Amino acid sequence: MNQELLSVGSKRRRTGGSLRGNASSSQVDEGQMNRVVEEDPQQQARHQEEEHTARNGELVGANPRPGDQNDTQQGQVEENNNRFISVDEDSSGNQEEQEEDEEHAGEQEEEEEEEEEEEEMDQESDDFDPSDDSSREDEHTHNSNVTNCSSVSDLPAHQLSSPFYTKTTKMKRKLDHGSEVRSFSLGKKPCKVSDYTSTTGLVPCSATPTTFGDLRAANGQGQQRRRITSVQPPTGLQEWLKMFQSWSGPEKLLALDELIDSCEPTQVKHMMQVIEPQFQRDFISLLPKELALYVLSFLEPKDLLQAAQTCRYWRILAEDNLLWREKCKEEGIDEPLHIKRRKIIKPGFIHSPWKSAYIRQHRIDTNWRRGELKSPKVLKGHDDHVITCLQFCGNRIVSGSDDNTLKVWSAVTGKCLRTLVGHTGGVWSSQMRDNIIISGSTDRTLKVWNAETGECIHTLYGHTSTVRCMHLHEKRVVSGSRDATLRVWDIETGQCLHVLMGHVAAVRCVQYDGRRVVSGAYDFMVKVWDPETETCLHTLQGHTNRVYSLQFDGIHVVSGSLDTSIRVWDVETGNCIHTLTGHQSLTSGMELKDNILVSGNADSTVKIWDIKTGQCLQTLQGPSKHQSAVTCLQFNKNFVITSSDDGTVKLWDLKTGEFIRNLVTLESGGSGGVVWRIRASNTKLVCAVGSRNGTEETKLLVLDFDVDMK
């Protein structure tokens, strides 16, 4: 019986077979252990003879040498006590070898599939900043040292084979237990006692599950650690175990030190097989899928990609479409990305459109930051006139000029699709939604255009001076004029629905959210209107000079003035909440999103504010700041884009305020070249450039930062 066990054990060693299936990568083979722990020559010869005999299909130990008979019997008991295999005495060695060959063939196929999957994951991981990898490795090393669970196999191969290491291995440092004998903390669980009375080959531990493997078994996801019970336990084992349990913690450690010193390599290997899985607990696999996904949702996307390379089950979780939809929602990504795959996806690994959308957006952001600046598309038009207004929606660009025309351009091809002719004065304001374009002119009219055909649908009469500003909301547009009035129009019928009168000077800026109208004028006033009743709800007084810019989010009104200040108002009460100071000149442009305000000033600086607290978060300045007045700006959750009279367009980091790089630098910058307007989408930047002295040709520049997802 013992001889058959040893024969099967030798075959298991030779093929690497184990019923545990997924063995820890830190387990070592017996060849490595033989190099690490020195053995006497007789013992080495005996192991070599056993392996040679096993290869020829003979029973090991049938004819032991007389001098080694006792050692052989003792080795048989140890071999059986240190194996995780269950022996069926009726099965033959050839049958087991055939089964294991099939098992290894299947494992080889799985490894090939995993290599292909890992290549794809590596490509995705490359898209993210790897700067945190070193810190994660340091953390892993630190944790390994704290738990004392590292093994010999974790060492590099050259270190294992080093003569110095081999000679010094057996001089293992013992635990310094000290003079005091103190027990472990109450949280330490006692060792489990095996049930040796069972007649079966292997039985599960009868104690309450306390390890990861036990928990898996309790949940029906795996088997508990099985113990070898096919051999009668040695006399006095139970008494020794009871005595061991009665010792204090340090005394147990001392006993374990001595026990390890007396073990052979195969016994040390067995201990590692038992101990190491306890420090590699995959708690994610224990949880229901919903809870596992909830836990993974707290990871950063780059960490999710790393987690996906842990194992197949983790990759299935990390590819979950709903998980990536939440990540996209956090980044403001509204649509999933459906791409054609070049290869067939293996069963069980479903492509995530939301994950693809997230990775695409990350690549686009990287292009904005440090991608190669390719030559922009140049859209020439309007001769040498000034481009006074600029709109960009989808793949369509609309530019208005003081040459009395508007032009519609393709952002993809750069071609002028049509020229909108009809105004008899310069165009100074415009709005666009879908296929509708609305323009305001010095000829005192507004016109509604069909962007597809270039047809003028309506001409809106009523103002008695230049239409200087407008704001479109759904089917209505509100216009402000130098005649000091505001008018509300229905763009479908062309009718003037309401006239708002109250300002005593030209209206310079207007905002409309569909319920209330907010206007700023040269009379230093900001007014809040109910357009349906044509009544002024609040007159916001405080500025000491002309109001040039406005922002309105439905709760707060933000006004910028020539008096250098910016004021934040409560739209319901009309009270001034904050006065933002710091700029030195006219605030010519502002943008407000989610309580974050970015303001551009004629003093060449840009500031980022929190309107809830009134605090200035960042001032975009320094050696790379603009050298002249800021003409236009736009921002998203990552970047701020600014243009200036100095002929440059600059990119800044919204959170840190750091300068990233110049996106546009005109050769005539500083000598007359000006960037008048900018408009940006997620992937494109449109700049209206020219000059006031003829040094720069009037044109549009289109820069593309999109990526190709194959």
Curated annotation (Swiss-Prot):
<comment type="subunit">
    <text>Homodimer; homodimerization plays a role in substrate binding and/or ubiquitination and degradation. Component of the SCF(FBXW7) complex consisting of CUL1, RBX1, SKP1 and FBXW7. Interacts (via F-box domain) with SKP1. Interacts (via F-box domain) with pseudophosphatase STYX; the interaction is direct and prevents FBXW7 interaction with SKP1. Interacts with cyclin-E (CCNE1 or CCNE2). Interacts with PSEN1. Forms a trimeric complex with NOTCH1 and SGK1. Interacts with NOTCH1 intracellular domain/NICD and NOTCH4 intracellular domain/NICD. Interacts with NOTCH2 intracellular domain (N2ICD).</text>
</comment>
<dbReference type="GO" id="GO:0030674">
    <property type="term" value="F:protein-macromolecule adaptor activity"/>
</dbReference>
<dbReference type="GO" id="GO:0034644">
    <property type="term" value="P:cellular response to UV"/>
</dbReference>
<dbReference type="InterPro" id="IPR001680">
    <property type="entry name" value="WD40_rpt"/>
</dbReference>
<feature type="compositionally biased region" description="Acidic residues">
    <location>
        <begin position="87"/>
        <end position="132"/>
    </location>
</feature>
<dbReference type="GO" id="GO:0005634">
    <property type="term" value="C:nucleus"/>
</dbReference>
<keyword id="KW-0158">Chromosome</keyword>
<dbReference type="InterPro" id="IPR015943">
    <property type="entry name" value="WD40/YVTN_repeat-like_dom_sf"/>
</dbReference>
<dbReference type="InterPro" id="IPR036322">
    <property type="entry name" value="WD40_repeat_dom_sf"/>
</dbReference>
<dbReference type="InterPro" id="IPR036047">
    <property type="entry name" value="F-box-like_dom_sf"/>
</dbReference>
<dbReference type="GO" id="GO:0048471">
    <property type="term" value="C:perinuclear region of cytoplasm"/>
</dbReference>
<dbReference type="GO" id="GO:0042752">
    <property type="term" value="P:regulation of circadian rhythm"/>
</dbReference>
<feature type="compositionally biased region" description="Polar residues">
    <location>
        <begin position="143"/>
        <end position="158"/>
    </location>
</feature>
<dbReference type="GO" id="GO:0031625">
    <property type="term" value="F:ubiquitin protein ligase binding"/>
</dbReference>
<dbReference type="GO" id="GO:0016020">
    <property type="term" value="C:membrane"/>
</dbReference>
<dbReference type="GO" id="GO:0050821">
    <property type="term" value="P:protein stabilization"/>
</dbReference>
<keyword id="KW-0227">DNA damage</keyword>
<dbReference type="GO" id="GO:0050816">
    <property type="term" value="F:phosphothreonine residue binding"/>
</dbReference>
<feature type="modified residue" description="Phosphoserine">
    <location>
        <position position="26"/>
    </location>
</feature>
<keyword id="KW-0677">Repeat</keyword>
<feature type="domain" description="F-box">
    <location>
        <begin position="281"/>
        <end position="327"/>
    </location>
</feature>
<keyword id="KW-0833">Ubl conjugation pathway</keyword>
<dbReference type="GO" id="GO:0030324">
    <property type="term" value="P:lung development"/>
</dbReference>
<dbReference type="GO" id="GO:0005739">
    <property type="term" value="C:mitochondrion"/>
</dbReference>
<dbReference type="GO" id="GO:0070374">
    <property type="term" value="P:positive regulation of ERK1 and ERK2 cascade"/>
</dbReference>
<dbReference type="GO" id="GO:0005730">
    <property type="term" value="C:nucleolus"/>
</dbReference>
<keyword id="KW-0234">DNA repair</keyword>
<dbReference type="GO" id="GO:0019005">
    <property type="term" value="C:SCF ubiquitin ligase complex"/>
</dbReference>
<dbReference type="InterPro" id="IPR019775">
    <property type="entry name" value="WD40_repeat_CS"/>
</dbReference>
<dbReference type="InterPro" id="IPR020472">
    <property type="entry name" value="G-protein_beta_WD-40_rep"/>
</dbReference>
<feature type="repeat" description="WD 4">
    <location>
        <begin position="503"/>
        <end position="539"/>
    </location>
</feature>
<feature type="region of interest" description="Disordered">
    <location>
        <begin position="1"/>
        <end position="158"/>
    </location>
</feature>
<feature type="modified residue" description="Phosphothreonine">
    <location>
        <position position="208"/>
    </location>
</feature>
<feature type="repeat" description="WD 5">
    <location>
        <begin position="542"/>
        <end position="581"/>
    </location>
</feature>
<dbReference type="GO" id="GO:0007219">
    <property type="term" value="P:Notch signaling pathway"/>
</dbReference>
<dbReference type="GO" id="GO:0016567">
    <property type="term" value="P:protein ubiquitination"/>
</dbReference>
<dbReference type="InterPro" id="IPR001810">
    <property type="entry name" value="F-box_dom"/>
</dbReference>
<feature type="modified residue" description="Phosphoserine; by SGK1">
    <location>
        <position position="230"/>
    </location>
</feature>
<feature type="compositionally biased region" description="Polar residues">
    <location>
        <begin position="69"/>
        <end position="84"/>
    </location>
</feature>
<dbReference type="GO" id="GO:0090049">
    <property type="term" value="P:regulation of cell migration involved in sprouting angiogenesis"/>
</dbReference>
<feature type="repeat" description="WD 6">
    <location>
        <begin position="583"/>
        <end position="621"/>
    </location>
</feature>
<dbReference type="GO" id="GO:0030332">
    <property type="term" value="F:cyclin binding"/>
</dbReference>
